[in-house]
Amino acid sequence: MTAEQLISFARGAPSLDIVDVEGLKAAAARAFDTDPAGMTAYGTSVGYVPLRKWIAGKHGVAPEQVIVTNGSLQADAFLFNHLVAAGDGVVVEKPTYDRTLLNLQNLGGKVHQVTTDAAGIDVDELRQLLESGLRPKLAHIIPNYQNPAGVTLSLERRRTLLQLAAEFGFMIFEDDPYADIRFRGEPLPSMLSMDTDNVVVHASSFTKTVCPGVRVGYLVGPAALIDAIAKKATNLYISPGMVSEAIVHQFCVSGAIDRSIATVSAALGERARVLADSIRRHIPGATFTEPDGGYFLWVDLPEDIDVDRLFPVAAKKGVAVVKGSDFLLDGGKHSLRLAFSAVTVDQIDEGVRRIAAAIDEVRA
């Protein structure tokens, strides 16, 4: 099986056909023409200043509340390193992004996973944990089209989560890189925009709406916290990548970002629908929540299918998936995360057929 023949539902990245390469070329040319000195210099740890101001305007905050970083994972790392010490309690969703688990565990944090359902994190379960004595430093939440579950946190639960954070004294880390990629329903307000108690730090990225290669993300939060992180960033790398950030800035101010979001959302909406239909047709025992946006669909397979056994069989049949157990401290043995962002529509049904064939072989 060659790389060209492999159908991969593994990587959460857009396929090249939905990346606005020409728009990026034009943005790069404008950036070099407009501000050659600014974009080729070291810059400051808060990021490329015009982009910082644009992000502040997008979120309705002061520029002092924004730091631009080398991708959202860098933003995550800055916040985790600033807030979490060995032994500190941290709440995350169950399931959650695998690198979140890894990074928090590497810091020595005591990670508590709280059940996630079709409406997001179970706030009643979280309240029970808090009332039992848990005092976390932060709760890491992916509110829109969550990675890996694909679900969206309901408006009611967003309100409750904000109330719990204020009542029990923890920060909400609203990790929101997928928010703009909605292809069904109406958008919900961010918890950042709803916050009246300074309990939210918001992160996002241009990886999903522009392209992964730009490596531009950001944090928005209380000015004092952002200033403290910026000082640490100065010692770490002086400044993030000014060239990438200047290109992203031109991509945004020209309106290309809006066209890119529309293109990506339309393409991924079609892929998500085709994937859901294919699963219903070829794996009738599977259950899942069809996402309203984002990159991912989480599938619970029948209990007689162990994904540790399925994974190598699927690989031999030319389809790559990610095991649900990668996103959990325990469990996930019968679940898969399927990323539909990098597969084209004409690959999806064949990919699901291969998964179904692998399931049949595991059962045989």
Task: For every predicted segment, state its role.
Residues 40, 229-234, 254-276:
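Structural signature of PLP-dependent enzymes
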Residues 192-228, 240-243:
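Active-site PLP attachment segment
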Residues 175:
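Glycine-centered flexible beta-alpha turn that most often forms the glycine-rich phosphate-binding loop
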Residues 220, 298-300, 339-341:
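Short hydrophobic/aromatic beta-strand micro-patches
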Residues 316-317, 329-364:
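PLP-dependent enzyme catalytic core of the Aspartate aminotransferase-like
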Residues 1-45, 57, 170, 316-319, ...:
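N-terminal "arm"/small-domain region of PLP-dependent enzymes with the aminotransferase-like
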Residues 249, 266-276, 287-300, 313:
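Conserved glycine-rich beta-strand-loop-beta hairpin in the small C-terminal domain of fold type I
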Residues 38-168, 180-197, 268, 346, ...:
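Conserved core of the PLP fold type I
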